[in-house]
């Protein structure tokens, strides 16, 4: 129950010792990725906000009747309309896949089209000579093109930052140098999630000694049953609250069995794939990364 999860996190945070100092309270850019792994309502709010800000046309001087950019305007409007439909149909359940890739391919094509239009401007400028009206039209088209271009650029940047692949494959590996606040970040996120009533377990690399990680995890939380039964009930809690339960392990590189993670981590991720309402976050010191993290874990297991 909630009490078990709360006790686990409190014990782990206490065991972080001097590495955990609540006053620093990390609110780094990394913290938002935990919402992404867990697919929390806050993640979806950010997703809607980021995309919505681009969907809302800010300029009333669109140039849909322009010979030069009218077609681009109509393609832009079509993509925006389809994005609006896709957002209204977005399935927020933890086991659903977020797939906006075909729309993003169209955005990419639009950017290419925009570059082609931009190239044509140069020849148009040289042929306008002295005709003021033509020149005014050309300048209005160019100003609008710049605006579309800037909006598209910010939108694609914001979209990248949503890390949709991580929301679909909830396995996050945090790599950082010693003392950069990894333990603090995990402790902070775990405590805050528990306060918010979100299912969270936090283990330390040093918790994993002789036994397998399966028995370590089940015995630490006092679960009677197999590891798969434990995952099944943890998964069920995630499904009930409507965002993923998070399993977090800080400092995989610490503890007597650290190098065993090189063989085991892929196996753990593989077993989690059957439980879509569980996300995994692990941290590792950068200097031990290659010793502890399996080769190709990003491509083979979809980890970020």
Specify the residue positions occupied by each region the protein language model found:
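Walker A/P-loop-proximal flanking segment of P-loop NTPase domains
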Residues: 2-171, 242
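P-loop NTPase signaling cores
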Residues: 1, 98-304
